[in-house]
Regions:
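Nucleotidyltransferase catalytic core that binds NTPs
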Residues: 290-424
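Short glycine/threonine-rich catalytic loop with a Thr-x-Gly-x-Asp
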Residues: 236-255, 412
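Short active-site segment of divalent metal-dependent hydrolases/proteases
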Residues: 10, 251-252, 311
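Divalent-cation-assisted or electrostatically stabilized phosphate/pyrophosphate-binding catalytic cores
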Residues: 26-33
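Active-site metal-binding loops of divalent metal-dependent hydrolases
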Residues: 7-8, 139, 250, 303-304, ...
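Ribokinase/PfkB-type carbohydrate-kinase core domain
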Residues: 1-19, 34-240, 260-293
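Hydrophobic, well-ordered secondary-structure elements that form the walls
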Residues: 248, 255, 268, 355, ...
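Short, conserved phosphate/pyrophosphate- and ester-handling motifs at nucleotide-, phospho-/glycolipid
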Residues: 181, 217, 248-249, 308
Length: 424
């Protein structure tokens, strides 16, 4: 089990269409508003880790009001979440209401008062609970004060503490890892002139505050991991950004997910980037699911007897559609059944070896059936890619995948034409 502690927020999205401006002010007139509710802040982190299959205790404070009850009910709906939520009559539940016109945010209304700080000590005293990681989600709403003493206890217990900070880093002294964004890095430390300068500034802060790692998020620029050993850059994939709300929470959850699965910190950073990318391509506050972080497998198949420019173009374009490109080729016996005894020209070992030389190809599999249906069912790829001599309804296994992509043929190139010229 992991513990998520911090400022829990109710995110409200009021959305509707707008076709005209108000005559009273230069603002859109929105009609037919629909309202949706999502967990935000530390509650969003918890929903993301729980959505990824991690048993998660969430510790926070809500007001004794309708919004607090609603937030608790949303959290309680996930069976991987254990609630440790307190209620107060002195402050209202923190609510962020976003007004959306045609999917564009035009205003945000925040309802909040500063909460008193909560501590980890009471959680450490819970009998029977053994936390592998503690995730601190600080939105600077009062719940998280200076927790260096608690972090010291956590370290003594062998618990790694990861912090998403919103205050000066001295408040998180003794944490295992802090994850500021670039703006926070510049505000609480100083603005670096280049990556080497960032390394020096970051390492000085790590030493000063007894923190092992600093993971700086750079938006579309990826992430930078700083430790006493140095600095490492991680690139982010190019994606169409729909909504950045809660993306930092999702990336933090992706990081914890990787660590909880026994992956290295660097491998977990890659998952954090992927989680953030998934979040920003979805509307509102997105909650991750386990399938979101698995490799997006692209699948294509064929004989690939005599490799030509058309094959190369298809493979290169297919690779761009996902994380891993798997190429399945017919065995020699399968080719003979389909194309006659004169084929293949190159045996299956030669064809597979040739395909493995292309950097865009991650895996080559030889299948012995007449079609790759059983293999597709086993691999569960997200996308099947075929050449332009197919239509989508002709593609074997199309009902097993999320998407079928047809790539236009490279004119003038085909194995049949090449063999015809040789025979002439």
């Amino acid at each position: 089990m992991i513990l998520v502690i911090g400022d829990v927020i109710l995110d409200v999205f009021k959305q509707g269409p707008s076709t005209r401006l108000s005559p009273e002010a230069p603002v859109p007139v929105i009609t037919n508003l629909k309202t949706r509710y999502y967990p935000g802040g530390a509650a969003n982190v918890a929903m993301n880790t729980a959505g990824l299959g991690i048993q998660t205790m969430i510790r926070g404070v809500v007001g004794a009001d309708e919004e607090g009850t609603m937030l608790e009910n949303i959290l309680h709906s996930n069976h991987n979440i254990v609630l440790a939520i307190s209620k107060t009559y002195h402050q209202p539940t923190i609510v962020k209401t976003r007004i959306m016109a045609n999917n564009q945010q035009v205003a945000r209304i925040d309802t909040e008062e500063e909460f008193p700080a909560i501590t980890l000590q009471e959680v450490f005293n819970l009998e029977g609970e053994d936390f592998e990681y503690i995730v601190v989600s600080d939105y600077n709403k009062g719940n998280i004060g200076n927790m260096s003493n608690e972090f010291k206890i956590a370290r003594e217990k062998g618990i790694k503490v990861l912090v998403d900070p919103k205050k000066e880093f001295r408040n998180y002294a003794g944490a295992w890892l802090i994850k500021p964004n670039f703006k926070e890095f510049c505000e609480f430390l100083s603005k670096p002139s280049d990556f080497d300068d960032m390394r020096k500034i970051g390492q000085a802060a790590l030493e000063k505050y007894n923190i092992e790692y600093m993971l700086v998020t750079l938006g579309e620029g990826g992430m930078v991991l700083i430790s006493t050993q140095g600095l490492k850059q991680f690139d982010a994939p190019v994606c169409d950004v729909y909504d950045i709300t809660g993306a930092g929470d999702s990336s933090l959850a992706g990081l914890v997910y990787g660590l909880s699965k026994g992956k290295t910190l660097e491998e977990s950073v890659e998952l954090a980037i992927k989680a953030g990318s998934v979040a920003v391509t979805n509307p509102a506050t997105y909650q991750l699911r386990q399938g979101d972080l698995r490799d997006k497998i692209v699948f294509t198949n064929g004989v690939f007897d005599i490799i030509h420019a058309g094959h190369i173009k298809l493979l290169e374009q297919a690779k761009k559609l996902g994380d891993r490109l798997v190429v399945a080729i017919n065995s020699d016996a399968s080719v003979r059944r389909l194309k006659g005894d004169s084929r293949p020209i190159n045996d299956e070992e030669t064809r597979a070896h040739t395909l493995r030389q292309f950097s865009c190809v991650d895996e080559v599999i030889v299948f012995h059936e007449d079609t790759p249906y059983d293999l597709i069912e086993e691999l569960k790829p997200s996308i099947i890619v075929k050449g332009g001599d197919y239509t989508k309804d002709q593609v074997i296994g199309s009902e097993l995948v999320d998407e079928v992509v047809i790539i236009p043929l490279e004119q003038g190139y085909s194995t049949t034409n090449i063999l015809g010229k040789i025979n002439e």
